Design a protein with these regions (language model features):
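Membrane-integrated ABC transporters
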Residues: 1-53, 68-87, 101-105, 109, ...
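Juxtamembrane helix-loop junctions of ABC transporter transmembrane domains
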Residues: 10-21, 44, 52-65, 90-137, ...
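Transmembrane helices of ABC transporter permease
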Residues: 34, 38-51, 157-212, 283-297
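Pre-NBD coupling/linker segments of ABC/ABC-like ATPases
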Residues: 344-356
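ABC-type nucleotide-binding domain
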Residues: 354-609
Length: 609
């Protein structure tokens, strides 16, 4: 009875996609063609060894015929020695040629694995912000590593196993058919039935189940990464048991899918062995009939049986190889999808590096909407930010503040209009040159699990230690760094978890100081810090903004009083703008309403304390 997709199995849909082998094989062959010489050496070595194996049954039959004539027959002794020498020579040739192929396939496969992993990483790095927001990092890592090792299995299966096996099968059937057409025809028909049945079962019966189990394998990796990355939150709520249970729910679903896949492999193997048993009976029975009819000598029967057992072994292996091939294809499918995924933002063909000197930013009639949203967030937005001007962005959540700075960084492309920096359209500039001249301090700074010095110098990789320390001093970070056991060599943990929120903020500010970019984006995050850290960060922020075009996303309005101009966003429109004094004077203004609400909240909290 055919299994119905389970309602909670969101991954079942993957089984409905076109055959993965039609997508994966061209992908791998493209990488083979990048190493034509190595591909030729491998094919020559392995096929040459296979041809040597093909002729061994012939000389085995000659040896048996010579032995049956008796040792007294001089010609028989001569024939036996010739057959023996040929068998040894063929065996030696097979070993040498096979070693040539094996030695060549090691660097061949390693280079492809390296290229595939590098290319996948490069593409993932350049995918859109939305893609990363909607993807588990752990799942992506699992797709790449699983696909990379599946490529090793794929190469071994095709080049070391399947190609030689098919050559032996074809060659043996031809040679056998030249001696006895009837037996050759029986083996040929049986082999074709076996191979066709194996391919059909692998692609139509096993592959859909394997796709689903692979999707759940990826989900297990994502669930693990999600819980481990947020371990501090798990501990703070004492939720270890809850996360254990959540993982086990995913693992149980994964186990059911994998169990189904593995059972399908077993059922397929049972069918394969049954077909081989029928073929064996037909060949042995046919050989006996030929011998009983006097149409075959003992040597002929030996040749037939030796050839058949070689064919039998290779046929059995072909079944296993096809299953392995299908398994490797399924394991690579998600990796190939990464390579086929379109990049979110692509440089124009004639893109040139942008040169930002003053930092004037102009939005000219900009229209923008997210993804498939019909209603645009921005519809004809225009604003001119002067070089060196310090701008605050204020508004309710979802009003368009964060989108504004993402468009400045060109993390998204506008739907209409254009954005200019120093008179240059950023859509015509290379992304790398644009973003390298815009420093950003995020609300939740993200640090690499590397040393503090490496994190500070991330925007200026060639910076000297003296420059790194000076940037840390300007960010009020130098003193706390020196108190750490290894100072600037201290590893900060994944995403900087070894540091407090205020310390991470100051490291991020030091990174921005060292980058020394003409445009600065500050996602203000002092509201969640203690008063001492807030004062240190506020002082560093004021120092950092001097002489730079600065855009501050303000979450606490008290931090924007000193800015030149404040832009008040509401539903994608700039509804108010001016300095703090001008905006607070508007009785019915949104800015004044937000400011008074925050002031009342602050007073309530202070009174409660």
């Amino acid at each position: 009875m055919r299994r119905k997709p389970q309602p909670d199995d969101a991954m079942t849909i993957k089984a409905q996609k076109p055959a993965a082998i039609r997508v994966v094989m061209p992908f791998v062959f493209r990488h083979w063609l990048k190493q034509p010489v190595m591909t030729a050496v491998i094919a020559f070595g392995l096929l040459g060894a296979t041809v040597a194996d093909l002729f061994m049954p012939i000389y085995s039959g000659h040896l048996v015929d010579a032995l049956t004539k008796g040792a007294q027959d001089a010609s028989a002794r001569h024939d036996a020695l010739i057959a023996f020498a040929a068998i040894v020579a063929l065996g030696f040739t097979s070993i040498v040629l096979r070693m040539v192929g094996l030695q060549a396939i090691v660097p061949f496969t390693l280079r492809i694995m390296s290229d595939v992993a590098r290319d996948a990483f490069q593409r993932v790095q350049r995918f859109s912000t939305d893609w990363h927001a909607n993807s588990f990092a752990g799942s992506t890592v699992r797709k790449v590593t699983r696909g990379m090792w599946a490529l090793d299995l794929y190469n071994d299966t095709i080049l070391l196993a399947l190609l030689p096996s098919l050559a032996v099968l074809l060659g043996s059937m031809i040679l056998l058919g030249l001696h006895w057409t009837s037996l050759g025809l029986v083996i040929a028909v049986g082999a074709l039935i076996y191979v066709a049945m194996t391919v059909a079962l692998s692609t139509r019966y096993i592959a859909p189940a394997a796709r689903v189990s692979n999707a759940w394998d990826t989900k297990v990796g994502g669930t693990l990464a999600d819980a481990l990355t947020c371990n501090a939150v798990v501990k703070s709520f004492g939720a270890e048991a809850r996360e254990d249970a959540r993982l086990m729910r995913v693992i149980n679903r994964w186990r059911r899918r994998v169990n189904r896949t593995w059972l399908r492999y077993n059922y397929t193997a049972a069918v394969q062995l049954s077909v081989l048993l029928c073929l064996r009976g037909s060949v042995i029975g046919g050989s006996l009939l030929l011998w009983m009819a006097g149409r075959a000598s003992p040597g002929d029967v030996t040749y037939v049986l030796t050839s058949y057992y070689i064919i039998h072994a290779y046929l059995r292996d072909v079944g296993m190889h096809i299953n392995n091939l299908q398994r490797s294809v399924n394991d690579m499918e998600e990796l190939v999808e990464i390579h086929d995924e379109p990049l979110g933002i692509v440089d124009a063909a004639d893109a040139q590096p942008i040169a930002i000197t003053g930092g004037r930013i102009q939005f000219e009639d900009v229209t923008f909407h997210y993804g498939g949203h019909r209603v645009p967030l921005y519809d004809g937005l225009s604003i001119d930010i002067r070089a060196g001007e310090r701008i605050g962005l204020v508004g309710r959540s979802g009003s368009g503040k964060t989108t504004f700075v993402k468009l400045v960084q060109r993390l998204y492309d506008v739907s209409g209009g254009r954005i200019l920096i120093d008179g240059q359209d950023i859509a015509r500039a290379t992304q790398q040159s644009l973003r390298s001249q815009i420093a950003i301090v995020q609300q939740e700074p993200i640090l690499f699990h590397r040393s503090l010095a490496e994190n500070i110098a991330y925007g200026a990789p060639g910076a000297s230690m003296a420059a790194i320390e000076q940037a840390a001093r300007l960010a009020n970070a130098h003193d706390f760094i020196l108190r750490l056991p290894k100072g600037y060599g201290t590893l900060v943990g994944e995403r900087g978890v070894k540091l407090s929120g205020g310390e991470r903020q100051r490291v991020a500010l030091a990174r921005a100081f060292l980058a020394d970019a003409p445009v600065l984006i500050l996602d203000e995050a002092t509201s969640s810090l203690d008063s001492e850290s807030e004062a240190l960060i506020q002082e560093a922020m004021e120092r950092l903004m001097k002489g730079r075009t600065s855009i501050v996303i303000a979450h606490r309005l008290s931090t924007v009083r000193s800015l030149n101009r404040i832009l008040v966003f509401d539903r994608g429109e700039i509804v108010e703008q001016g300095n703090h004094a001008a905006l607070i004077a508007r009785r019915d203004g949104i800015y004044r309403s937000l400011f008074e609400r925050q002031a009342m909240e602050f007073a309530r909290i202070t009174a409660a304390e």
